[in-house]
Amino acid sequence: MFRLGAIWAQTDAGIIGRDGDMPWYAPEDMAYFKKVTLGAPVIMGRRTWESFPPRFRPLPGRTNIVISRSVTEAEERDGALWVPSLDAALYAARDAAGAPVEATPADTAAVDAWIIGGGSVYAEALSRTDLPAFGRVKTVERTHFYCQEGNEITGDTRAPELQLANSAGSCEGSSPNGCWRVTSESAWENSEKGYLLDESGTKNPMYFSFQRLERI
């Protein structure tokens, strides 16, 4: 069975977006995203696709698969494959993952395809255990942004909540998104050029850490 991952960036409050965009500028996160996903199919919703500047889409070195209710069957458009549902996207990702790619696979090549947004696509993918060809999302890569007290960043889109395992390696009760453990976490760093943008337009200092989680 193919292995499916999800990747996103979030504040410590779980914010991943505001007004159809990301309330930050994070060059380190963009570089990490490229490193992780390069060479693998990426699955996204229409709004995520449209949030990329036209000069950056399709994302190079990756099969771009866009989910949109505006199509009833798969069709090629603007350098991407447009499909009507998450299930259709996963079948397309399976087919693409089994074909040679021009780009060099990322260091996390154990993941065959990535979910990259937006909120509703993450929510459906993380909560399901019957995803065609993949079963369920098994890996999450997330960039965690720390907001200094008094500089909290607000937004209208949140990341899926992931329940972390206790010291015994299990989770109490049940969670719709399953039980997870952190397998790697980088030290906190202060971004030299990046910033978190509050609703007033003020640029606030950005501290970030990269985390990898695996489903138990």
Question: What annotation goes with each model-predicted range?
Answer:
Residues 1-216:
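Enzymes that bind and transform nitrogen-containing heteroaromatic metabolites
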